[in-house]
Design a protein with these regions (language model features):
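Active-site-proximal beta-strand elements of phosphoester/diester hydrolases
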Residues: 3-6, 20-24, 71-77, 91-93, ...
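Metallo-beta-lactamase
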Residues: 54-98, 177-196
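Conserved acidic residues
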Residues: 43, 123, 150
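Active-site-proximal loop/helix segments of hydrolase catalytic cores
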Residues: 83-147
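Short beta-strand scaffold segments in enzyme catalytic cores
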Residues: 11-14, 92-94
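Pre-active-site segment of Zn-dependent metallo-hydrolases
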Residues: 13-46, 54-64, 75-87, 107-118
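Short secondary-structure boundary segments
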Residues: 49, 129, 155-157
Length: 205
């Protein structure tokens, strides 16, 4: 069993056969019209950086006997001026039952090929498209052209259907123009085995 469960904003529950983790849980009140959901106990909580919409570790329970979960990471700017405005951010890559899942956190600028080298040809790329606090769709296009993920999933954008997330000028529509090979998922859970042969973009509703 290998699953990605979308928890809203930039947060996900990643589940393997015997281990699980939550990345970037958000403080209640930090993201417009979103409340962090109740989540089963996990082995580890990972935060890309220490902003309130990404670091609510206390909202996630840890298992009594947690399994260590390793990750490949890279520290990058949260902005387009070397971190001077918003500090630094960590990209993480996890191996979930053989699926390589990369989470860009709040990456704030286009990154060079050397920085992105460890993440090339990943199975899943979870990437922000806010365009103000993070990169937007155009910057992501350049990053995706280097990483070449099998599946791209956008995050950290205003979701009109739920009136949730930070206003961003409807970045999801610009994203869909740049990445036209997309498919909407009918639930907030992705079974990776069901999509092991899929290539393209997946969107959570």
């Amino acid at each position: 069993m290998s699953k990605i469960v979308y928890l809203g904003h930039s947060s996900f529950l990643l589940k393997g056969n015997d281990y699980s983790l939550v990345i970037d849980p958000y403080q209640n009140g930090s993201v417009p019209n979103l409340k962090f959901p109740n989540v089963e106990p996990v082995d580890v909580v990972v935060c890309s950086h220490e902003h309130a919409d990404h670091n609510a570790r206390e909202l996630v329970n840890i298992k009594d006997n947690p399994t260590p979960v390793g990750a490949v990471s890279a520290t990058v700017p949260h902005d387009d001026c070397g971190g001077a405005k918003r500090g630094l951010n960590k990209i993480h890559m996890f191996d979930i039952e053989g699926y390589k899942i990369v989470h860009l956190g709040d990456t704030g600028c286009i990154l060079d090929e050397r920085t992105l080298e460890p993440f090339k040809n990943c199975d899943i790329l979870l990437a922000p498209i806010n365009g103000f606090y993070t990169i937007g769709p155009r910057e992501l296009k350049e990053i995706a052209n280097i990483i070449k993920p099998r599946i791209l999933i956008p995050m950290h954008y205003y979701m009109k259907e739920h009136n949730s997330g930070y206003p961003d000028g409807n970045m999801i529509e610009e994203f869909k123009k740049l990445f036209p090979n997309y498919r909407y998922l009918d639930k907030e859970e992705l079974d990776l085995d069901e999509y092991k042969n899929y290539q393209g973009v997946l969107l959570f509703r």
